[in-house]
């Protein structure tokens, strides 16, 4: 009976450890995805802020050569 209890506790302990590791990896993956989304949004904002400068540069070139 004691052997069975020890075996059961060992199985439960190992199950909890593996579950904890999986949850930690899942949390890290979600954080990486969130960080990547934020990076993409900031790059998009930087690009969108350059559009007026590009348009004015093209317009001034068109006036100069046209």
From Swiss-Prot:
Region (Disordered): 25-44
Composition bias, Acidic residues: 30-41
Sorted UniProt keywords: Amidation, Amphibian defense peptide, Antibiotic, Antimicrobial, Cleavage on pair of basic residues, Cytolysis, Fungicide, Hemolysis, Immunity, Innate immunity, Membrane, Secreted, Signal, Target cell membrane, Target membrane
Keyword Secreted assigned: yes
UniProt xrefs under InterPro entries: Frog_antimicrobial_propeptide (IPR004275), FSAP (IPR016322)
TM region positions: none
Signal sequence segment: 1-22
GO biological-process terms attached to the record: defense response to bacterium; defense response to fungus; innate immune response; killing of cells of another organism
Subcellular location: Secreted; Target cell membrane
Pfam families assigned: FSAP_sig_propep
Family classification: Belongs to the frog skin active peptide (FSAP) family. Phylloseptin subfamily.
UniProt name for this protein: Phylloseptin-S2
């Amino acid at each position: 009976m004691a052997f069975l209890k020890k075996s059961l506790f060992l199985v439960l302990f190992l199950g909890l450890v593996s579950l904890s590791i999986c949850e930690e990896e899942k949390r890290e993956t979600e954080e990486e995805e969130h960080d990547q989304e934020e990076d993409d949004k900031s790059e998009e904002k930087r690009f969108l802020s350059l559009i007026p400068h590009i348009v004015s540069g093209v317009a001034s070139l068109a006036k100069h050569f046209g």
